[in-house]
């Protein structure tokens, strides 16, 4: 399912317009991005939580040339599925 299909499905279930649903989804995603970018976590009970982590700098190797390269430290995005979401996927 892509973003437009998600918008269509939510609009059909809620009776809201597709434009309104699309705007709401865009706003929701923007709020999550801003919070996680600041280092906060976003917890949606029953669904999961979004957060950020840190990956330390490390040494890597170019598989083509065998040359050793330095990989800089980076922030990562993490999503942890909630129990209810996992159970729904596994149909427990």
Swiss-Prot record:
One of its GO terms (molecular function) is structural constituent of chromatin. InterPro entries: Hist_DNA-bd, Histone-like_DNA-bd_CS, IHF-like_DNA-bd_dom_sf. Pfam families: Bac_DNA_binding. PROSITE patterns: HISTONE_LIKE (PS00045). GO terms for biological process: chromosome condensation. The keyword DNA-binding applies. CDD domains: HU (cd13831). Keywords: DNA condensation, DNA-binding. Histone-like DNA-binding protein which is capable of wrapping DNA to stabilize it, and thus to prevent its denaturation under extreme environmental conditions. Heterodimer of an alpha and a beta chain. Belongs to the bacterial histone-like protein family. This is DNA-binding protein HU-alpha. It comes from Burkholderia pseudomallei (strain K96243). The lineage of its organism: Bacteria, Pseudomonadati, Pseudomonadota, Betaproteobacteria, Burkholderiales.
């Amino acid at each position: 399912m892509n973003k437009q299909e998600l918008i269509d499905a939510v609009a059909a279930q809620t009776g809201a317009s597709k434009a309104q649903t699309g705007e709401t989804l865009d706003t929701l995603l923007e709020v999550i991005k801003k919070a996680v970018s600041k280092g906060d976590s976003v917890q949606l009970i029953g669904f999961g939580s979004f957060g950020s982590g840190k990956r330390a700098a490390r040494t890597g190797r170019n598989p083509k040339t065998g040359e050793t390269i330095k990989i800089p430290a980076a922030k990562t995005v993490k999503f942890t599925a909630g129990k209810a979401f996992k159970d729904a996927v596994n149909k427990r």
